[in-house]
Structures are given as structure tokens and as C-alpha cells.
């Protein structure tokens, strides 16, 4: 969950988000080292006579500034590719939920059940109860079992949308006529908030997403009460 004046990313709730946080720290450290090196060279140029205006050929330097960036790019690309393949890998999901984007609400269908579907609208500010979050609460939450692999099928009925839940490391485009898929697995119970992350019209800011992750026994009771 995000909070005011937050400087970092949201706490990771899924294995994918933990990997993304590690990759973020890894890349940020590389950027910090490069920036420090550049600032050090600039300071030397300003404070000493570190100039080579008459140099016509420097093969050693050219070799270094060719090989060193290549090594840095490899150090960034390899962990990035690993995470990309992890995000695309879906093996034997325990549950499949189909998500459809509309202007300006979400609809959900639990495809493993015969008749379990609903629409999810934002609760207007004037109808919020004490303690509820402005522009983030919905009338129907998406209840899911924790510690299980869940496949999300995402599409749109009208324009481009994007289904995003930051604490789970999820962001998948909802494209009309195309069915995208992603996977999630939450390690802790709780409420996880997200929003539409693709500008989709005048009420784009009013398309929140709320996932309620509960133990499997609670999920079975909830689904049985709706069937």
C-alpha cells in the first residue's frame, strides 16, 4: 500500500515483485557507480590539467569505452531477461479470472465456476465510510486465494486500458479484441489496490482495482455464498 510522501516502491507481496525490487536496486547501483565515475572525471578536468587536445589516436581508451559499456549492458540485460521469462511462465494455475475493461469500470468472471461474475465500480467520495480510501475503494472486490498461482486473462470492451496492481508487480494492457494473460501469487493476505494505468477517457482516474487475498478456506466460503 502506498502512503503520503513515499520515496520508494511499495512493499513486495509476490515473488515477482520481490525480483523486480532486487533488479531495481541492482540497476540503481550501476547507475550510481557510472554517475560517480563521470563526476570524478569532470572534477579532475576542472581542477587539474587533465586535457589531451593534441592527441590524435588512443586505441586503448577507445577499447575501454567500447568494452566497458558492453559489460554494463550485459549486467543489466541478463537479470532483466530472467524476470521477463518468469513473468511469462504460467504452469498449472489453480484459478483463472477473466478481467474486462470498460469506460469506466472493470468486470470480472471466474471462469472455473459456472456463474460467478460481477462488475466493479468505484465508490463515490460522498459514499465512503470512515477509514476507506478516496478514489481507491470499489463496490465489489476481487476475492482471491493466497499462496496459489492465479491466471488473469485481461481484455477490453471499448478502448485501451491497463490493469495494474503495483504491490504485486502487475501491469498488463487491456486491448480490445485481444486477450492478454498474466499470473499472480500473493504470499500474504490483505487488500491490494491498483488503478487503470492507461489514459482511457475523461473518467480514467476513477477505475480502481481492489484485490482481497484470503486463505483458501475463506475463498471457498465466499465463492459458495455467491453461487
Swiss-Prot record:
Its EC number is 7.1.1.9. It catalyses: 4 Fe(II)-[cytochrome c] + O2 + 8 H(+)(in) = 4 Fe(III)-[cytochrome c] + 2 H2O + 4 H(+)(out). One of its GO terms (cellular component) is mitochondrial inner membrane. It is a multi-pass membrane protein. The chain crosses the membrane at residues 15-45, 60-87. It comes from the Eukaryota. Cu cation A1 binds at residues 161, 196, 200, 207. Its main location: mitochondrion. Residues 46-59 are mitochondrial matrix. One of its GO terms (molecular function) is cytochrome-c oxidase activity. Component of the cytochrome c oxidase (complex IV, CIV), a multisubunit enzyme composed of 14 subunits. The complex is composed of a catalytic core of 3 subunits MT-CO1, MT-CO2 and MT-CO3, encoded in the mitochondrial DNA, and 11 supernumerary subunits COX4I, COX5A, COX5B, COX6A, COX6B, COX6C, COX7A, COX7B, COX7C, COX8 and NDUFA4, which are encoded in the nuclear genome. This is Cytochrome c oxidase subunit 2. It comes from Ailurus fulgens (Himalayan red panda).
Amino acid at each position: 500500500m502506498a502512503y503520503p510522501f513515499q520515496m520508494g516502491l511499495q512493499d513486495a507481496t509476490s515473488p515477482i515483485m520481490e525480483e523486480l525490487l532486487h533488479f531495481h536496486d541492482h540497476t540503481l547501483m550501476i547507475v550510481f557507480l557510472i554517475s560517480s565515475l563521470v563526476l570524478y572525471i569532470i572534477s579532475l578536468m576542472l581542477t587539474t590539467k587533465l586535457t589531451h587536445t593534441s592527441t590524435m589516436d588512443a586505441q586503448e581508451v577507445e577499447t575501454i569505452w567500447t568494452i566497458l559499456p558492453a559489460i554494463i549492458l550485459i549486467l543489466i540485460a541478463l537479470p532483466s531477461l530472467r524476470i521477463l521469462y518468469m513473468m511469462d511462465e504460467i504452469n498449472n494455475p489453480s484459478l483463472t479470472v477473466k478481467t474486462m475493461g470498460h469506460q469506466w469500470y472493470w468486470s470480472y468472471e471466474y471462469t472455473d465456476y459456472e456463474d460467478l461474475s460481477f462488475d466493479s465500480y468505484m465508490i463515490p467520495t460522498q459514499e465512503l465510510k470512515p477509514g476507506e480510501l478516496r478514489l481507491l475503494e470499489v463496490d465489489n472486490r476481487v476475492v482471491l486465494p493466497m499462496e496459489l498461482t492465479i491466471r488473469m486473462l485481461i481484455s477490453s470492451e471499448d478502448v485501451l486500458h491497463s490493469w495494474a496492481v503495483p504491490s504485486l508487480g502487475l501491469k498488463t494492457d487491456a486491448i480490445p479484441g485481444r486477450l492478454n494473460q498474466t499470473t499472480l501469487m500473493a504470499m500474504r493476505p490483505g487488500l491490494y489496490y491498483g488503478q487503470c494505468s492507461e489514459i482511457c477517457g475523461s473518467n480514467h482516474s476513477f477505475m480502481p482495482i481492489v484485490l482481497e487475498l484470503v486463505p483458501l478456506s475463506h475463498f471457498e466460503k465466499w465463492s459458495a455464498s455467491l453461487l
